Amino acid sequence: MESAIAEGGASRFSASSGGGGSRGAPQHYPKTAGNSEFLGKTPGQNAQKWIPARSTRRDDNSAANNSANEKERHDAIFRKVRGILNKLTPEKFDKLCLELLNVGVESKLILKGVILLIVDKALEEPKYSSLYAQLCLRLAEDAPNFDGPAAEGQPGQKQSTTFRRLLISKLQDEFENRTRNVDVYDKRENPLLPEEEEQRAIAKIKMLGNIKFIGELGKLDLIHESILHKCIKTLLEKKKRVQLQDMGEDLECLCQIMRTVGPRLDHERAKSLMDQYFARMCSLMLSKELPARIRFLLQDTVELREHHWVPRKAFLDNGPKTINQIRQDAVKDLGVFIPAPMAQGMRSDFFLEGPFMPPRMKMDRDPLGGLADMFGQMPGSGIGTGPGVIQDRFSPTMGRHRSNQLFNGHGGHIMPPTQSQFGEMGGKFMKSQGLSQLYHNQSQGLLSQLQGQSKDMPPRFSKKGQLNADEISLRPAQSFLMNKNQVPKLQPQITMIPPSAQPPRTQTPPLGQTPQLGLKTNPPLIQEKPAKTSKKPPPSKEELLKLTETVVTEYLNSGNANEAVNGVKEMRAPKHFLPEMLSKVIILSLDRSDEDKEKASSLISLLKQEGIGTSDNFMQAFLNVLDQCPKLEVDIPLVKSYLAQFAARAIISELVSISELAQPLESGTHFPLFLLCLQQLAKLQDREWLTELFQQSKVNMQKMLPEIDQNKDRMLEILEGKGLSFLFPLLKLEKELLKQIKLDPSPQTIYKWIKDNISPKLHVDKGFVNILMTSFLQYISSEVNPPSDETDSSSAPSKEQLEQEKQLLLSFKPVMQKFLHDHVDLQVSALYALQVHCYNSNFPKGMLLRFFVHFYDMEIIEEEAFLAWKEDITQEFPGKGKALFQVNQWLTWLETAEEEESEEEAD
């Protein structure tokens, strides 16, 4: 199959199709995974029977021949498909669709090959994406389905078929690897060769073509709307450790998919999403870090939505057209009539090949290649002059003074004939025919007509549409340049001027008017080109690292920070080299004194303040040095402690945050570097400052430990070993409070211990209340049901146990009321502590209800807190469903009792 796809020749019918394959050259397709399994040998029905050796050899030869024949048949099918795709045009669409369905798509392998060919063709030719999308719609409906009948989906949604599934899989693969081929060339340090520039241009066209093809398929409901939203979110999302200026390719793809399928997605249900997308695009549009071209693309896309998705005329007719439509557009926009090809006997090339025609006037047909065959003849051989059209042959009956306008064959510029060009005999002939009148006052008024603003132009081009008369080109603009160095001499500016802004053709004098001869025309102004300034190539990576080493060494010796910053500025380093330069700054100071390390940290902070480096640059540099730790530890054993100092100073100077530092160090990566960094922060600042900063960061400390140590007991042990247990005072309280209650359960002693050991700030913390209530409940349970007693949770406790439980709870009542009184939210936390305690004890019979009644009767918890606990919905504490089931009847009684009391008070 791969060979047939790679060869990609036209089918044997292509000779009679008439030049249909001129839109794209054959491409080599990559091998696809999963095809070889369809080409292997398959055992026959008698695989289990004993077969003589001679017969086996014959069967092996037969199987090999069958496999070869099968491969040849597949090759023939794929060649025929390639030929059909090469001939696909709007006129032949229905006919070629039937041919494609009848090529012999009888297996999933062949269908997959057809999809690969169609997708690759659509990626090569983005202008024809809508045509290939229509082809996919037809194949999705009519191609064989090898997956079997599927369950009925939602109404209005396309049924999933083999074709649709394989197509989406291929497009997903192209989308996920969209920038891979372009990045290969963008990451080169040296300038690209012309061949590499061409390959990069092809890769970029295929990347944008894939996005446009996805959008066209989305228009036809072949791709679900949710998939389109996922694509847009992926393109808008800023990746980790990716600079904003490196998002250009994704943002260009984003603009392409918005232009293609934006109107379909912008409906009432998705309005909030679209508003978020465009708010993000507006913010990116104002970012100076992005290239100007990307910012203008974003601006055009935002303006497109503001104008209710009505594109400018330049984008209206950007799809495939029939030949008749192209001819009609030429008449309407250019004033050029391009007749259909005639018989050779009906043509008269009097002006093009006559004896009086100057050599410069003979247009060369070769540069246009197959375009000339499609148009029938060259543009300019028949020129429109108002409502009538001057034909490409001379006839005396067409008017006494009418004649063809003469155009320069290279750029379509009006060229006044002179005596020296035509010769004496030619000059007399031209005068006798009145052709000199065509150039009277030719240069006047031409530039003023070009200066008018066109409605079809973007606002930023409204003041740039001024051209000289010798800059106008009538050649059809190329869709792209394969090589940036191959720039047309007279074409670049005219491609930005829409047809409505181009100057009108010069009118010939009316019939009967005497031509005025001998008038001089103003010569065109010659603009002097500014002298080319030779640009100094950017320094290489090795040069930058050497310069960085020199600057940093001088800075560490002299301490002049401003001189070091200016030295880095003068390097004019590309931004993608900054992380390695910062890594060099860190490494150079690692084996020096603490003062030098502090100087290096200050230099990095200054570079950020000057706008040279960013937080992402520092994190990339920091991680680069961490990756080199095994080598560095040979010469610098305490390298992780020194790196922790750099990280701590970066956090203090707000170069990075604790959460940004923690993210790449999760699951014990480079353990114990994160804890060493916290130690340095506590040393450089103070404990209270670090505790507040750490709590604001919302970092999960358990996740920062190796997986084997990710539990509370082990975490507390490690933190105590590093002197960081002050970060989690409640974790330490949970372990020590129960121990203190067992030593002396009197309320006075417990309250005094809490007051002496727990910060007053934590007395109103929900976590503290949870631990306090849990400790009391655990102590009561251990006293009522000692661990030595084997009690069944399903059996009811004795009267003595119930009385003991009540008396113990009464003894702790003063402490509970001290911390819970008038705090409904803390009372709800106390109820959740009771719920979790019962859950961990497997909900002993009647325990939850008994404690609810005790809390209510002893006025420890108010009615409002009980009802708030009932209505609260949270997944943080387990066992809520079973707990509600056990106390629901009592809570209902509580609600009715409260209502009766309120009614009595009202009476």
Curated annotation (Swiss-Prot):
Transmembrane segments: none annotated. The modification Phosphoserine is found at residues 11, 395, 443, 902. Keywords: Acetylation, Initiation factor, Isopeptide bond, Methylation, Phosphoprotein, Protein biosynthesis, Repressor, Translation regulation, Ubl conjugation. GO terms for cellular component: eukaryotic translation initiation factor 4F complex. The keyword RNA-binding does not apply. Disulfide bonds: none annotated. SMART domains: eIF5C (SM00515), MA3 (SM00544), MIF4G (SM00543). Residues 720-904 form the W2 domain. It comes from the Eukaryota. Residues 78-308 form the MIF4G domain. Residues 503-516 have a biased composition (Polar residues). Residues 543-666 form the MI domain. There is a cross-link at residue 575 (Glycyl lysine isopeptide (Lys-Gly) (interchain with G-Cter in SUMO2)). The modification Phosphothreonine is found at residues 89, 508, 514. The modification N-acetylmethionine is found at residue 1. This gene has been shown to be extensively edited in the liver of APOBEC1 transgenic animals. Its aberrant editing could contribute to the potent oncogenesis induced by overexpression of APOBEC1. The aberrant edited sequence, called NAT1, is likely to be a fundamental translational repressor. PANTHER family: EUKARYOTIC TRANSLATION INITIATION FACTOR 4 GAMMA, EUKARYOTIC TRANSLATION INITIATION FACTOR 4 GAMMA 2. Belongs to the eukaryotic initiation factor 4G family. Appears to play a role in the switch from cap-dependent to IRES-mediated translation during mitosis, apoptosis and viral infection. Cleaved by some caspases and viral proteases. This is Eukaryotic translation initiation factor 4 gamma 2. It comes from Oryctolagus cuniculus (Rabbit). The gene is EIF4G2.
